[in-house]
Amino acid sequence: MNDVNNKLIYWLDDYYEQFSSRWDKQKYIWKAVQTFQDNWDLTDPDLPKMIERSTADADYLMNHTRYYPRDMIIGLAKEKPDAIRSMFEELFDEKQNLSSRAIAFSEAADEMRVGCKGKYYSTNHQTMNAVSTYLWLMYPARYYFYKHSVAERVSSYTEISYANLREPEVNKMISEFSMLDQISEELRKEDRFRQLLDERLDNSLYNDDAMHCMAMDFAFYIRPCYEKSRI
């Protein structure tokens, strides 16, 4: 086993030991996916309400201080529902290149917000963070939530390669997906991680066969470990 895997296995062992104590605060990750899967329907005549309902449990990931992608997309759906429908249809079209459709979604939202009033439109909140969230909620066995600072710390601790800081944000997002693919693969190898979920999941929580939600949770777990080590 190489050094990279040794480091990853070390932190996975620690994550396993800490999982139970973190569960109540972190289970929103699995709930966010299931809520989205149960409610998302682009044919719904009330598009803003549908988006609001579908992303209700992802609010923690999508709205916080000075960052309002959820509020922004709901607001734009009220103003231009047909355009927003088309944007999501293209974003979720797996026949198209991932990088191209992610950039197209972000740029379309940026153009659409011009002329809109309110704090949600002062800047383009439909960044790769937001785009990755939509992709993950729609295809939880393929994608992940992306945040550069989290990915950077995971890479630092596990020594799994990650994009250069100067690369375009979409490249960083895709690089993070690749990194978390490696982590989810390790999680699937051991029954003990699956057992942790099976003992806790109910109908309100996504089953997570691919262990992508758990890989995300592992990434969130790594971040405070990294920050404590720098104090």
Residue ranges and their predicted role:
Residues 1-124, 140-231:
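An N-terminal alpha-helical hairpin/helix-loop-helix interaction module that forms a charged
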